Amino acid sequence: MLRISRVHIDYQKNPVGIAEMPQFGWEIVSDKRNVIQKAYTLQISKNPEFTEFVYDSGRVVSGKSAHLIPESGKLESATKYFVRVKADDGGDETPWSETAYFITGLTEGEVWSAPFVSAETEEADREVSKGTYVRGTFTVKKPVKEAYAMTTGLGLYNFFLNGEKVGKDEMTPGWTSYRRHLLYQTYEITDFLKEGDNVAGAMLAPGWYKGVMGLTKARNNYGDQTGFAMELRIRYEDGNEEQILTDESWKGCDSPIVFSEIYHGEIYDAGFEVLGWASKAEIPEGNWHQISVVPFDTNVIRAQSGARVQVIDEIPAKRIFTTPKGEQVLDFGQNMAGRIRVTATGKPGDVIWLKCFEVLDSEGNVYLDNLRAARAEMKYTFAKEGTITWYPRFTYMGFQYAQILSCPGEIKAENFAACTMHSEMEETGNITCSNPLLNQLHHNYLWGLKSNFLDVPTDCPQRDERLGWTGDAQIFCRTACYLMNTYTFYRKWLHDVEVDQTSEGGVPHVVPNIEEGKTDGNWLLSQGPHSAAAWADVAVIAPWTLYLMYGDTKILEIQYNSMKGWIEFMREHSEDYIWNYKLQFGDWVALDAEEGSYFGATPNDLTCTAYFAYSTGLFVKIAKVLKKEEAADYEDLYAHIVKKFQETFFDAEGNMTAQTQTAHIVALYFGLTPNAYREKTVKRLTELLEKENGHLVTGFVGTPYFCHALSQNGCVKEAYDLLLKEDFPSWLYQVKQGATTIWEHWDGLKPDGSMWSADMNSFNHYAYGAIGEWMYRVMGGMEADESAPGFQHVIYTPKIGGNLKFVDTTYHSVYGENRLKWQVDEGCVTMFVQVPVNTTAKIQLDGAKKVLDTDGLAFEKKQGYMEAEAGSGEYTIRYRQ
């Protein structure tokens, strides 16, 4: 049976907010082997009956089932389109797929026209962090066929129609480089409207826009007034259309949110509630006043079609306990990012007061020091007697625990639930194996992603930072792509990388660059506010990684000028191809740093030049993929950088001038080691590892590639040994200490229960979770092929080791489910492989001496392994090592 199991539209299911003709793709399943699509038919219609075609491809002879963009068909704004597809393999034909849909926002040629209205009209409002309401009324005079809303805000907003919150999105409009890039959200609102009087409204709060944020703790980073803008498109049954905008007739007043900030939490006083504020046509009671219109450059407003922040999971409190100091504490059993929903019964003046935190101290008491200045609290004051359920709307915290400072009535664990929040992305990868510690490690870096991919890839979710550090996002990118469908998330963020680049092409340390123009007085930024190696290289490495994982050249086309700008910045500021520029983080927080320093021992000119070469080499590949004539020029540049690196950082005997683990790792993994010295470099790396009793002492630059540098050079055992270390410093040390996420420091929590430091000690910092990439690519054996990216041709090449009895790895690509499970029994390996329809695979049996069961595949003997090509289907192979 041949059928289409799902349809992708711009990498999503039924996306809303499409601004241009999207990409289409589909997954085909079959119970046969070697199935390749020969033709497809794609239809787009304005109705689900498919009688009002916008596009009908007819039967197209093509094997393409991903990244397809129709060359004809014009989309209208604020319109719902229905999609279906069928395909055949030259013999069997699928039925029509289930009908999918997408909804457009403003399409090409239309510009944003709704003004921003603000209730913050007084000068004093500029310096406070309160919440406000804005509202307006309109009349629907006849039956509605369909209606859509496009909304955005300066600050954070929730949108209401006739008293109901519209959509599941939270923390809208998200965090972008607001002056250059602001997103609007699109909603289908037909069912929210009624004939007669209607009320539209929004709750607003400062958020990232005007709250206290960043390393410099500045207020009003993007503006000093919150605001809301709305455009409704209503189509009536009689064929007419009406447009309704925010305007000067709207009213505003303060809301019960008397304080709200990202770092510090939210305070809600129910005594200031205004009943019917978003549902009564007549002005309800309250201090309503005329709004002000906030000037804003509407040219930077763009549609958001995916990766919106939502409440994804709910975790009930596991227990309530009392610390040795007498503190009452909730334990949710998992470190996470989000908020707490609480149900309580009280009387006027009673207060619910919770303070969120990550870990207990060595005595088992509340530990808040690593939050630094972040208060991370939530407060609710009762206005009347009764039972309420409440949660903060415009903030989030990083926590496993919450201290109950005040709560009326009987306090029971069942009255508290943690609502985890992150950008909505489908989970695509999973690994389970015979070692439960490795299973927990996988859990930990997955939850590191869940906790920090909250609209931007932040470093941490708990302290007074939570910034889009480019280095963290770069080193974790490929791991993230295995774990979840991050294409839309990264595409949105990479646009901010581009718009925040300097005129020379330099890349800020954090994106969005909230620190722009605020370097004075900050010990770090005053040394250089942008363009650190490994951090800024995200401009090239992330688009390339997305291309490898999803097979889409569009991201390379979109980001090409950004990538080129970064390469040219490095070229301009290098001296004879050695690159080093102002503030460099180097091998950040490496354990070979001098006492009291965060900067590792590997010299900056080495790490900088290594990344200069690596990014330039990737850019050469990108230019060739896009068939750019200038590819040859950059190939020449790359050759010069590599030559200079080898002349500078290797001596005449082939020794590296820097005797650190990281120096050898990047030289090997980035392909910078002279061929004549490769074996010697590998040997020296293993010696440096042995010198530390088999432990790493690497930081942000060396850690992500350590196991790769070993396993790619014949040291698979050493790579597994490194991964499986259980004492400090190691990945599994954290697991053994009870971690449920990845820590910022290898010894954030020491064996005696004491802390690494108070000022920089996050327990939810995904960067070192980059080991996940090695676990998927090497331990799990699931590797993308550069010549057929996006897993159109997958290379199954697991390295057996680590005394593991089995490893079961799945990855859901744009073509379907890939699976590889290997199991070892007394020297005999059984490998189960699943290859999706319309893809092919290369299966490599590492160290195979004899294949006992080929399951119909033709294996050839290679140097150190056996290899066969396979079409789609399931295979079970047995071989002896």
Give each language-model segment a name.
Residues 1-80, 84-463, 471-472, 488-489, ...:
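Extracellular/oxidizing-compartment recognition motifs
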Residues 220, 224-231, 242-278, 282, ...:
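Non-catalytic C-terminal accessory modules of carbohydrate-active enzymes
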Residues 147-151, 161, 339-358, 394, ...:
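Alpha-helical support elements that line or immediately flank enzyme active sites
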Residues 200, 204, 269, 464-465, ...:
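C-terminal capping/lid segments that line or modulate ligand- or cofactor-binding pockets
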Residues 543, 613-616, 620:
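Non-transmembrane amphipathic alpha-helical segments
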Residues 157, 166-168, 173, 497, ...:
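Active/binding-pocket-proximal capping segment
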Residues 156, 229, 247-249, 253, ...:
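Active-site acid/base region of carbohydrate-active enzymes
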